[in-house]
């Protein structure tokens, strides 16, 4: 069994819980509140900047030239997507540049970006790869499910198209292939660290979407 298959099977419970979140179900049906989606877009833009930086560190740690190119390009794309959010979704949902810049990271976003940043700088290349993989892979699988269940004229169709398109899925398959290639060289201790990093990333994917649906800032301090 490929290492990626082991990752998926070990964490299938988290994927199913993520898929079942009201945010994703209502997004597919076009009934998600604009406020919840706007909250998500702002936090996703903050997240993507940190994700891009983590990808750049991953590229610097890569073993082979092809991997350096792969993750350098992925880092660039993360920033391009972050900027496109300003020009498309934020404009569509009346989120001004000032509102975005004045909105701090939520607890979920802060936790996720801090985990990725700390892992990128302090862990080995294989572990960094495993930590970054959930964002690629879970988004791709959720995107496919949403396409299968989406209504016609969905107000969130542009977002659905972004994460369900063939270009994104090709990139995801390439990252999975790199993870398998690198994992094949790793000892048992490193593989377990990769499993732990992937599971934490998968947990934080769930938390990010759940937090967006609840429009939660800092749990317990939202009204302080």
Name every feature range the model reports, one short phrase each:
Residues 8-33, 51, 174-185:
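Short alpha-helical hairpin
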Residues 19-20, 47-54, 81-85, 108-112, ...:
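Amphipathic, well-ordered alpha-helical segments in soluble domains
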Residues 168-199:
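Long amphipathic all-alpha helical oligomerization modules
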Residues 1-3, 115-117, 164, 210, ...:
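Hydrophobic alpha-helical segments
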Residues 194-224:
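Acidic, carboxylate-rich catalytic segments that either coordinate divalent cations
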Residues 66-170, 199:
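Active-site-proximal alpha-helical scaffolds that flank and shape metal-associated catalytic sites
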Residues 12-17, 32-61, 81, 130-140, ...:
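Alpha-helical bundle segments that constitute or directly flank the non-heme di-iron/ferroxidase center
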